[in-house]
Amino acid sequence: MISSNDFRTGTTIEIDGQVWRVVEFLHVKPGKGSAFVRTKLKSVRNGNVVEKTFRAGESVQQAVLEKSNLQHTYVESGDYVFMDMTSFEETRLSSDQIGRGSKYLKEGMEVNVIFYKDKVLEVELPISITLKVTETDPGVKGDTASGGTKPAILETGAQVMVPLFISVGEMIKVDTRNDSYLGREN
């Protein structure tokens, strides 16, 4: 249990069976009445943000999350198989459990998996990854002057918008948080 007075940004708590991360908190002492803590909570499972007010000193169940560094080894019948780099145990996750990041996974990639009570809550990919362009329209000389973009399909099947001068076979850096092109990889 944790007191609402001890909330800090990043603290994880459990309310009604759901795990929430404290995004913002403000301890308020009104001139009249008792003190309270106003918080902004983000659901770890789906990313929803809600505002909730707690009485000062109110006890809340703290959620202790476990973070494991796992390596993606292969895909078998729709499940992504990961290996724990310390215990060498295998963990199988569906694309639903991984979320939108599944389109960036390739063999050998290391990810952080967050567990709560032995259930997967979240899969954290690296912020930027380098992937090969496998399909895109050919670039024409002089295209860079307009500053436009075109769709490109990467080796994992993900689609991102890239500048017109990018061609098939080039290695590019991609931001996994918002699917944006970051630059060429040398």
Swiss-Prot record:
The keyword DNA damage does not apply. The keyword Cytoplasm applies. GO terms for biological process: peptide biosynthetic process. Gene3D superfamilies: 2.30.30.30, Nucleic acid-binding proteins. It comes from Prochlorococcus marinus (strain MIT 9515). It is found in: Cytoplasm. Keywords: Cytoplasm, Elongation factor, Protein biosynthesis. Pfam families: EFP, EFP_N, Elong-fact-P_C. NCBIfam families: efp (TIGR00038), PRK00529.1 (NF001810). PANTHER family: ELONGATION FACTOR P, ELONGATION FACTOR P (EF-P) FAMILY PROTEIN. GO terms for molecular function: translation elongation factor activity. This is Elongation factor P.
